[in-house]
């Protein structure tokens, strides 16, 4: 039935129902008409059979609205009332009755300053007003929804709270900013919702909320209303101490973990371990192993398990796989209370093409470039953020801020930075567009990274911003004031590639590859490096680290222990992927748990014990970390002994008296009466030896201290004579007086 009324202008009803009426709040809700002589209320409630207007003050009925058409449009005058008042709608459906606050009576909750900063590209907390946020508005509690869709004709939110009706809650349009918002009272935590967007082409697309803080488990993709309660943090002392922290002169031994496959539970090991179990098992394990940092591979919601989290759709939503957001907070809180810093792998380089995600969000290339030569990433068939667009920068800045602020992460590791820096990254000559100077540098991405790092360090002193950057781009860890990118650390991909290639050679031929062990020291102090043996080195058919090494098991395990000894004593912070600490035999499989049963075998237990002791040694002796990024913290004693596959070097702390001498032998030959130069006339003792029987070695060790002889050697005034273990690493320290012993 349709009632002829003067409540709607001609054509407005059809435009509203067809998703083409942009200024919905000028039509629906309470409005003064007839030059202020009357009040009318208009509403669109599909499925309703009658609607009454009640006074919110006393609950009395003011008017019954007329049904304008069969699509759920109702309208009516408020009797003699001419002054606006707060009201409720009593809606009668065929099987039930509902009392609701009409969302179209509420004004916008958007703050002009927030909107301005968002549009300027400098907003760091966009998540406080976009997405779904609990608010109290004119004494009414509810959820404020806000989304950016500047080219949409109409945006509606639909969900469990309105029976997924895409006409029930159409958002208010703010043309100047491109934002749409609405306040809805009748919403409950964990209800699902999506946005129905009438795009610029007249099509309707259904999208997840880019700022959703929780999402449905895959393969579903609805966003979820957050819980109201806040988490009660217990790490205030940690954060206070972190603010004065100087990470470059502190030990940093990072354990990289993918939570989905570290350890699973259930009879078939297919059930994810939740945060409570990770608190009980992973945190004590990290502490026992002596790692100072935990790095989580991406945990923003991702639909495809095989992406390992590197193709996130819900950038603000911790994945459902391990529990809720407060479970993640509790996990990080416990890490902090146990003295473990937590880093997050963050992916601002690209995003996937999932239709419910950011791709052509409002029918236009909103978050990505419209030209595929700038907007598409050929390696992963993903899309590249438009770093030159202010609102996109605000989105990404805010996401970084969100994880550091809301979850107390101690830093971010940025994935695939090289792909951001170069316009021609993985492209043929005809597949990219030069910058305005004719070069291949992505000036917009460079500016974004510089601003990101500067802002995050300013907001969160003591954090670490880390780049996975695989080229020779200069100044990755230089200050932005010096035209650098402003990162705190950079992964040393060159060291990783060279040394893995070296250990994959048969010892007989390593003499011809000796430079692959030594070349890293040519550039070791040009950046602030992290030596990384990450997940990327044990996937896609590359095999495990153990698998890369030739020879029988004795040679494989001995070489791996020696290699770890070289890594832990080489300048640079450390990162080791899970499973490598006990020499997993198979390459990493994201669909199953690590092979923990291997620890019942002595060689694997020996490698784990070796890594644990390396971490303890590393933290105990400042010479191994204080001058990681300064050339005066390192000295070659012998880097030219290629024929014997031997390296000898010395590490120094701030105090030159604090030093460590390292001998690495990458041949299976034992060297007796081997002379090593030392800086002082003191006795030296063998602190660690990878060939010790405790680690599964042949026990070619130096049990007794060696007296320094006044025999200049290798550029040093004194020397000692030792036995060098086969395929081994031997670490030596001077026997200091008790008061001079290094401390953590």
From Swiss-Prot:
GO terms for biological process: glycogen biosynthetic process. The active site is at 415 (nucleophile), 468 (proton donor). GO terms for molecular function: 1,4-alpha-glucan branching enzyme activity; cation binding; hydrolase activity, hydrolyzing O-glycosyl compounds. Pfam families: Alpha-amylase (PF00128), Alpha-amylase_C (PF02806), CBM_48 (PF02922), GlgB_N (PF22019). Pathway: Glycan biosynthesis; glycogen biosynthesis. SUPFAM superfamilies: (Trans)glycosidases, E set domains, Glycosyl hydrolase domain. Its EC number is 2.4.1.18. Keywords: Carbohydrate metabolism, Glycogen biosynthesis, Glycogen metabolism, Glycosyltransferase, Transferase. One of its GO terms (cellular component) is cytosol. It catalyses: Transfers a segment of a (1->4)-alpha-D-glucan chain to a primary hydroxy group in a similar glucan chain. Belongs to the glycosyl hydrolase 13 family. GlgB subfamily. Monomer. HAMAP family: GlgB (MF_00685). Catalyzes the formation of the alpha-1,6-glucosidic linkages in glycogen by scission of a 1,4-alpha-linked oligosaccharide from growing alpha-1,4-glucan chains and the subsequent attachment of the oligosaccharide to the alpha-1,6 position. This is 1,4-alpha-glucan branching enzyme GlgB. The gene is glgB.
């Amino acid at each position: 039935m349709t009632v002829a009324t003067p409540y709607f202008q001609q054509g407005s009803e059809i435009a509203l129902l067809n998703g083409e009426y942009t200024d919905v709040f000028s039509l629906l809700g309470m409005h003064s008409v007839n030059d202020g002589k009357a009040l009318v209320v208009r509403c669109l409630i599909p499925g309703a059979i009658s609607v009454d207007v009640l006074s919110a003050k006393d609950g009395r009925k003011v008017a019954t609205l007329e049904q304008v058409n069969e699509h759920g449009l109702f309208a009516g005058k408020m009797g003699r009332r001419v002054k606006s008042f707060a009201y409720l709608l009593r809606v009668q459906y065929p099987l039930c009755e509902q009392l609701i606050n009409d969302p179209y009576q509420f004004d916008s909750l958007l703050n002009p300053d927030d909107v301005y900063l968002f549009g300027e590209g400098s907003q760091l907390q966009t998540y406080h007003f976009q997405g779904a946020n609990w608010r109290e508005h004119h004494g009414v509690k509810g959820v404020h929804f806000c989304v950016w869709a500047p080219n949409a004709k109409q945006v509606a939110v639909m969900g469990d709270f309105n029976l997924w009706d895409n006409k029930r809650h159409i958002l208010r349009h703010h043309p100047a900013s491109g934002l749409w918002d609405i306040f809805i009272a009748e919403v409950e935590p964990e209800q699902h919702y999506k946005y129905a967007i009438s795009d610029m082409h007249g099509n309707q697309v259904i999208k997840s909320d880019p700022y959703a803080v929780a999402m449905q488990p895959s393969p579903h993709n609805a966003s979820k209303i957050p819980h109201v309660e806040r988490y009660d943090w217990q790490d205030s002392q940690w954060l206070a101490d972190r603010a004065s922290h100087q990470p470059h002169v502190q030990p940093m031994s990072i354990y990289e973990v993918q939570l989905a496959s570290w350890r699973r539970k259930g009879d078939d090991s297919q059930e994810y371990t939740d945060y409570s179990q990770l608190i009980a098992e992973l945190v004590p394990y990290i502490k026992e192993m002596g790692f100072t940092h935990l790095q989580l591979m991406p945990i923003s919601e991702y639909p495809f398990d095989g992406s390992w989290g590197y193709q996130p759709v819900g950038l603000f939503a911790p994945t459902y796989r391990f529990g809720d957001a407060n479970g993640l907070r509790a996990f990080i809180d416990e890490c902090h209370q146990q003295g473990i810093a937590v880093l997050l792998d963050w992916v601002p380089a690209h995003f996937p093409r999932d239709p419910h995600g950011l791709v052509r969000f409002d029918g236009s290339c909103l978050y990505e470039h419209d030209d595929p030569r700038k907007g598409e990433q050929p390696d992963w068939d993903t899309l590249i953020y438009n770093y030159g667009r202010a609102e996109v920068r605000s989105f990404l800045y805010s996401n970084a801020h969100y994880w550091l602020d809301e979850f107390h992460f101690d830093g971010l590791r940025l994935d695939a930075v090289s792909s951001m820096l170069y316009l021609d990254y993985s492209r043929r000559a005809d597949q990219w567009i030069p910058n305005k100077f004719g070069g291949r540098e992505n000036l917009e991405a460079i500016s974004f990274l510089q601003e990101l790092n500067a802002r995050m360090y300013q907001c969160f002193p003591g954090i670490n911003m880390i780049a996975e950057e695989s080229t020779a781009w200069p100044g990755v860890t230089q200050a932005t004031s010096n035209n650098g990118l402003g990162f705190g650390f950079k992964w040393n991909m060159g060291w990783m590639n060279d040394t893995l290639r070296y250990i994959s050679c048969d010892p007989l031929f390593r003499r011809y590859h000796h430079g692959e062990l030594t070349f890293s020291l040519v550039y070791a102090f040009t950046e602030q490096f992290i030596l990384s043996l990450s997940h990327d080195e044990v996937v896609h058919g590359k095999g495990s680290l153990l698998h890369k090494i030739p020879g029988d098991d004795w040679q494989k395990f001995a070489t791996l222990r020696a290699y770890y000894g070289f890594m832990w004593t080489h300048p640079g912070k450390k990162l080791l992927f899970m499973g490598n600490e006990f020499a997993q035999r198979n390459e990493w499989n994201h669909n199953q748990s690590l092979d923990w049963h291997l620890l019942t075998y002595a060689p694997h237990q020996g490698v784990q014990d070796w890594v644990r002791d390396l971490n303890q040694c590393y933290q105990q002796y400042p010479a191994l970390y204080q001058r990681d990024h300064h050339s005066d913290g390192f000295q070659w004693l012998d880097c030219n002994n290629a024929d014997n596959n031997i390296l000898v070097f010395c590490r120094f702390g701030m105090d030159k008296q604090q030093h460590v001498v390292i001998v690495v032998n990458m041949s299976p030959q034992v060297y007796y009466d081997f002379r090593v130069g030392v800086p002082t006339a003191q006795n030296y003792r063998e602190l660690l030896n990878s060939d010790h029987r405790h680690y599964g070695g042949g026990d070619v060790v130096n049990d007794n201290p060696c007296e320094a002889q006044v025999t200049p050697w290798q550029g040093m005034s004194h020397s000692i004579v030792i036995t060098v273990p086969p395929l081994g690493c031997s670490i030596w320290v001077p026997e200091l007086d008790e008061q001079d012993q290094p401390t953590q």
